[in-house]
Amino acid sequence: MADERRQVHGAEYERAGAGYMEKRQLRAGAAGWVLLAGLGIAYVISGDYAGWNFGLAEGGWGGLLIATLLMAVMYSCMVLGLAELSSTLPVAGAGYAFARRALGPLGGFATGTAILIEYAIAPAAIVIFIGGYVESLDIFGIEAGWGLYLAFYAVFVGIHLYGVGEALKLMFVITAVAVVGLLVFVVAMVPEFDASNLTDIAATDAGGASDFIPLGIAGVLSAFVYGIWFFLAIEGVPLAAEETRDPKRDMPKGIIAGMLALLVFAALILTLAPGGAGAEALSGSDNPLPDALGIAHGEDAFVTEFVNYIGLAGLVASFFSIIYAYSRQLFALSRAGYLPRGLSVTSGRKTPAVALIVPGLIGFLLAAITEDGATMINIAVFGAALSYVLMTLSHIVLRYREPELERPYRTPGGVATTGVAFVLAIAAVVATFFVDEKAAGITAGVFAVALAYFWFYSRHRLVADAPEEEFEAIERAEAELAG
């Protein structure tokens, strides 16, 4: 390993040697824009089946509608910004890489850490929900517990270890099955819609309360977290950049197509589920779509049973896909030296084996020991919201700092678009404290420990060869030539 070190922006870089990057190669060309769109939908689709409805208890239907509309605007604006950033900087680091270019090593690591918290914790929460779902369906008498959690982690981490192309294609099929379930639900609920069902939660004496927003203005803010569920994790699509055939063209098309589909699903589910079954009836449901069908058509109706079983595919799709996401973010942070370098070594099949297994083991232990899916998903939401603030800020900073940077896709509206997302992301961070102070506190604690690790250790050991860091070297060389 080369001994030469160079200090840039308060961090120390070294050349890791010729063989370093050869041991850290992903399989290029595994995905086109259609698979990327499917990946984006897969990340999110479990949120259409469950979770969003708890916002009915926090803000009523009107409060959740307002929150969802605002979050839809935030995600849409952010996705347009990410489409530009991912075509401009098409590397596996994604959000970390964007912030690294705009905000320096500390900003890059902070963003990557927030994303990693989101993606490492979310599968642990989802596997708990899968366990509850399997038990409620009485599939072969299987009960929720550590054995089931271990089996799901082992199977789906194993598929990712086998190969990214195979994993993405299987993920696409599972996601397609889950989408069919949503479409069947929509067709079955359209004839049952009654607008009076949307506002059947009684108004309270909270400030600003009415029949439309029965829990007042505070209820709207509390519902933000649940409006996020319709879109949470779509921002992970750029993590596939190094495994995409033509990232400069495919990445914008894939992430935007995925977002458009999610907007349609959110509008249909939020309107038809409570509109057919009643907002109050679904406000505490663990399985809102089957419960809505049960109220409208009967618990023993074929359509109710069908969507109930298909709902498991939605949970599995998100679990499967987010494992992919955490491995790529961890891989990129490790490859660049922000986290231990051994975590980024790839296998002979060009999959980041260690980055798949280590967070999987941690997630399994969290699920088995705590069995507290609600707290963990709120931790994931808090991490996500922090990353949104930093990623949208990165887009704004890069537009002003590097206006001549080659941008194969340009965000419509420019910084005005991502500026809207930035403001709403700050509001989303604040909203997490209204819903779960414990989860927000845990996330902040983990974040602080990670930043301390960076400040006192890893910033002195960064790798100049990593693609996300080479942009810095190129920029510095150009500046020296110009000078």
Stretches found by the model and what they are:
Residues 25, 170, 342-353, 388-439:
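C-terminal membrane-solvent junction of multi-pass transporters and transport-like membrane proteins
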Residues 70, 378-379, 384, 413-483:
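A generic transmembrane alpha-helix motif of multi-pass inner-membrane proteins
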Residues 10, 23, 97-101, 106, ...:
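Helix-loop-helix connectors at the membrane interface of multi-pass transporters/channels
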Residues 97, 104, 135-140, 204-207, ...:
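TM-loop-TM module centered on a large, flexible mid-protein loop between adjacent transmembrane helices
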Residues 22-26, 64-65, 141-147, 173-308:
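Helix-loop-helix junctions that connect adjacent transmembrane segments
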Residues 51-58, 67, 76-153, 157-161, ...:
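Hydrophobic transmembrane alpha-helices that form the core helical bundles
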Residues 1-54, 58-65, 75-76, 80, ...:
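Membrane-interface "cap" regions at the ends of multi-pass membrane proteins
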Residues 131, 144-202, 255-260, 380-390, ...:
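Membrane-interface loop-to-helix entry segments
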